[in-house]
Amino acid sequence: HKKLSKRSGHASYEDLIDQGFLTEAVINFVALLGWSPEDNNEFFTLDELVKEFDYHHMSKTPAVFDMTKLRWMNGEYLKKMDFDKFYEMALPHMKEVVSRDVNFEKLASMIKTRIEIWADIKDQIDFIEQVPDYDINMYVHKKNKTNLENSLEVLKEVQPLLEKQEDYSNDALFE
C-alpha cells in the first residue's frame, strides 16, 4: 500500500483513465479513501455517493492508495456492466490486438469476467493472432494420468466437445 503521491507513479485521474480504469470505479474508489459508509457497502453510483456521504464517518488515519483494490473494484464494475456497453468499449482494445476476422461479440463475452482493466484485454486474446510457444510439459499431469504420449489422444477426444460449446465462461466450461 502506498500513500497517493505523484512521485510514486501515476496519480492523476487522467492517468488512471489512460491505464484503462472506468470513471465510475475511480470515483467510487477515491470516495472510499478515508471514508467508511455506515452500511459497509463498497459500490455506489455518483448519486448514491452524494446521498450517502457523511463526514462523520471520515477516518483520522491517512488514506492509503491500494492499486490492487482499485483494479479489483474496476473489474467488478466491468463484470456488472451491460454487455452492449462493455462490447462497445472493449471493441477498440480487441481490434488493437486482433486483425483477423473473428466474432468480436463472442470474444467480448469470453473476456468480460476475466479482465480488471481494458489493458488486460491484450494478454487475454493475443493468442488469436499468434499462438505463443508453450512448454510441452504442460501436457504432463500425474493426477490426471496424462503424459506426452497420451495427451494428444485426450485433446482429440475433447475437441468435439469444445467445438459444440457455445458458452466459454468458466462456469459453463466446468459444468
Where are these regions (language model features)?
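Alpha-helical recognition segments enriched in aromatics with Gly/Pro capping
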Residues: K2-L78, K85, P92, E175
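Small-residue-rich helix-loop
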Residues: F83-E175
